[in-house]
Amino acid sequence: MKSLIYGYGLTGKSFERYLKAKNIEYDIFDDGTPELKNIQPFDSYENIYCSPGIPRKIFNSLKSLNTVYTDIDIFFKEDKSIKIGITGTNRKSTTAFHLSQLIEIKYSVNLIGNIGEPMLDHINNGSQYSVIEISSYQLDKMTENKFDFGVLLNIAPDHLDYHGSFQDYKSTKEKILESVRSSNESDPYKLYKWVTGFDIQLSNLKSLPYRFEKISESIINDSKSTNMHSLKYALKNAIGCFKDEHFVLVTCGNPSKEKFSKITLEEPSEVLIYGSHKNDIHKCINHPNKLIFDNLEEVLIYLKSKSSKQNILFSPGYPSGNDYKNFEERGSFFNLMVEKVFHD
């Protein structure tokens, strides 16, 4: 009897490698790929391997028909490393990345999960620790919590299109607190001591791109900002980063995920809005000096035309929407356009 892989993104492709290694026959179903829709009835498969992002109703429906596996459940069952789960609305990737850098000084470590490195590719690869960035989608579908250490960094409204309410999202995130040991600590050095029992010092922790990344003395690329909580964090930190000088905010993205909620911004001297969702954003943001542009190049040309140097914070506060595939593409494009407009 065949198994079925439901969803063919990063996790789905890792399921494929996993099943091939075990000589298990499978079909693939992906709602967004027409050629991967012609399959047998779902209840005719022995097992179904589900990607985390599929809607909850579909996941529960599949569970009523078959044995359903997620990548985190398989990893819990088969991998022998010490497992550290890190979740939160914001800064989970950065915290996981920094903690893994500290751990790898003395130990072998996997940095896996929602950060973009599939768990199934690292089962029993000899690493002593696994630092796992875990999303609310993964926590929601997780059968049971088998993290040795669980970290909940923060919670603010997010992914309400999936969860339906903030309370549901919050309850899902709090499942991480059912780990053997749990913490709300965000300092990677304190987390390292909590996990290993030892102190460590490393002055030069590397950072991930597009997370409040200072690409020049006067420009910050915070493309990873995809919600209001992360935008507020960036605005607060920009004040110190720009040494209390004026700065402009550049924003774009789709505000539907934030339910088109209104926000009053006081920190920036100007708010410059661009992209296909610009009119919606303009209605959501309350600020005395806000301007609309068709594209990013127009924004940067406008800033270049100013007589004085401009401090620029690019922190969209919304998902990419129709403008970019993801925050990585958005961040990369911002850097390219800065280079083109300011340095050509």
Where are these regions (language model features)?
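Short, basic phosphate-binding NTP loop
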Residues: 1-85, 211, 284-285, 293-309
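Active-site beta-alpha connecting loops in nucleotide-dependent enzymes
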Residues: 4-15, 29, 227-296, 317-331, ...
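Nucleotide phosphate-binding/pyrophosphate-handling subdomain across enzymes
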Residues: 18, 109, 185-269
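Residue-level signal for inorganic ion chemistry
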Residues: 19, 48, 86, 114, ...
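Short glycine-rich anion-binding loops that position phosphate/pyrophosphate groups of nucleotides
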Residues: 52-55, 91, 136-138, 157-158, ...
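Walker A (P-loop) phosphate-binding motif
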Residues: 71-114
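Conserved substrate/cofactor phosphate-moiety recognition/catalytic segment
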Residues: 109-125
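Flexible active-site lid/hinge loop adjacent to a nucleotide/diphosphate
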Residues: 126-186, 322-328
